Amino acid sequence: MQLNPSEISELIKRRIENFEAVAEARNQGTIVSVGDGICRIHGLADAMQGEMLEFPNDTFGMALNLERDSVGAVILGDYEHLSEGDTVKCTGRILEVPVGESLLGRVVDALGNPVDAKGEIKAEGSSPVEKVAPGVISRQSVDQPVQTGLKAVDAMVPIGRGQRELIIGDRQTGKTAVAIDAIINQKNSGIKCIYVAIGQKASSIASVVEKLKEHDALDHTIVVAASASESAAMQYLAAYAGCAMGEYFRDRGEDALIVYDDLTKQAWAYRQVSLLLRRPPGREAYPGDVFYLHSRLLERAARINAEEVEKLTNGEVKGKTGSLTALPIIETQAGDVSAFVPTNVISITDGQIYLETDLFNSGIRPAINAGLSVSRVGGSAQTKLIKKLGGGIRLALAQYRELAAFAQFASDLDEATRKQLERGQRVMELMKQPQYTPMTVAEMGISLYAADAGYLDDVEVNKVVDFQAALLDYLRSEEKGLLDELNSTPDYNDEVVGKMKKAVEAFKSSRTW
């Protein structure tokens, strides 16, 4: 076979003409060490703080420590298959999670992946987990209420839309119960809810989801679960992921409520990650930025004005304000509210609901200590009816607690003191409320009116709860018009007082309790 030089040169020319040299610029490095969910990488020159890093086998991580010679990263998920020498690539993206209406009714992990076996989620979009909180000019003052359905909360420590109200107490004092009742009560209020479970037992999370389903509350709720079996990085990120999901509704002129259960465990997870990354420890071995950890999260809960909503939606939504209300939970050790994390979160939030073990064990549930609990901005958001009647209730409880301390030592009490003590006992009984039984504004208002106007004074202390239950049954059957009127316009005036007085007196004359 004879070779033709011209054919060969022609073939080479054709190949050269058709050759496409594609140069791909890629920023990649090599794993130096890996263990405990932490990874050190050499060679990632242009990594950003909080950037997503791509590891082999579809595993992702997040850059947290940017040092001169290496990058410290947390691995999100399983890391057993990673080893020294593996290649790591920069993605050029900050960590994002899916957001939107399609997440309602679902249980997801800290990265927004479904964990409830109901199939994939077709999200409307995605949002960065870390966002800057709205500025002062973008905000609007808190003046609309979030009704929790709990008498003790709505009357004494009211919560407004866009507020941050801390729920603090020892373990087993009913902190989660207060938050879950608040979520259940939003069924017809239009408020979307996000429940973030951090570092809890998987069985506890399953039980909460079951209760929400049972009371038809799961349809308006997103559950973000980072159980105790998940890595510290996932527990640290879960709160920010839930917040991003809540901001989606806030920025569209809607109202959302987010529960962080609980931020103590998130601080523990962040402490673990920081110590493994060899950051210098401070008080209680927490890193120096543990205050910023919680402040940047809770400052994102806010009420934003209509101009800001219009700007964020490119003019699609006009004349509507949006809000994200936060209920962070903190667990104290033996009632010590002066520990590092509790004092931090108390100073960041707009008030706290303090739950006490002694009250809980004595059967007063929710176990709210009215003296130590406070709401700094919620008063301006209360309905007129509850605001007027709730003031008298709070005063009666405060006087009762003060006098009860003296009454232990005094043998003979004057008539006025004895009356105040007796009324205080009845108000304490009235504040008791079983779990999963939220009350409407009208039911709450009439119950508080009965106590405030002295209709409970001749009822035996152990019959107060029965009296209230019978009163509400009577109102639902005989005075439905009054309940509907108070629910639609909860004002406080002479006409309303007259109607409530007539209804309560009619019930008392029937003696059906």
Swiss-Prot record:
Q: Which domain of life is it from?
A: Bacteria
Q: What is its main location?
A: membrane
Could you tell me the membrane topology recorded for this protein? Peripheral membrane protein
Residues at site: Required for activity? 373
Q: What is its EC number?
A: 7.1.2.2
What PROSITE patterns does the annotation carry?
A: ATPASE_ALPHA_BETA (PS00152)
| Substrates-to-products reaction catalysed | ATP + H2O + 4 H(+)(in) = ADP + phosphate + 5 H(+)(out)
Note the SUPFAM superfamilies from the entry: C-terminal domain of alpha and beta subunits of F1 ATP synthase, N-terminal domain of alpha and beta subunits of F1 ATP synthase, P-loop containing nucleoside triphosphate hydrolases
Q: Where does ATP bind?
A: 169-176
Location comes to: Cell inner membrane
UniProt keywords (A-Z) are: ATP synthesis, ATP-binding, Cell inner membrane, Cell membrane, CF(1), Hydrogen ion transport, Ion transport, Membrane, Nucleotide-binding, Translocase, Transport
Question: InterPro entries, from UniProt?
Answer: ATP_synth_asu-like_sf (IPR023366), ATP_synth_asu_C (IPR000793), ATP_synth_asu_C_sf (IPR038376), ATP_synth_F1_a_nt-bd_dom (IPR033732), ATP_synth_F1_asu (IPR005294), ATPase_a/bsu_AS (IPR020003), ATPase_F1/V1/A1_a/bsu_N (IPR004100), ATPase_F1/V1/A1_a/bsu_N_sf (IPR036121)
Assembly description: F-type ATPases have 2 components, CF(1) - the catalytic core - and CF(0) - the membrane proton channel. CF(1) has five subunits: alpha(3), beta(3), gamma(1), delta(1), epsilon(1). CF(0) has three main subunits: a(1), b(2) and c(9-12). The alpha and beta chains form an alternating ring which encloses part of the gamma chain. CF(1) is attached to CF(0) by a central stalk formed by the gamma and epsilon chains, while a peripheral stalk is formed by the delta and b chains.
* Family (UniProt): Belongs to the ATPase alpha/beta chains family.
Role, per record: Produces ATP from ADP in the presence of a proton gradient across the membrane. The alpha chain is a regulatory subunit.
Q: What is this protein called?
A: ATP synthase subunit alpha
Gene name, per UniProt, is atpA
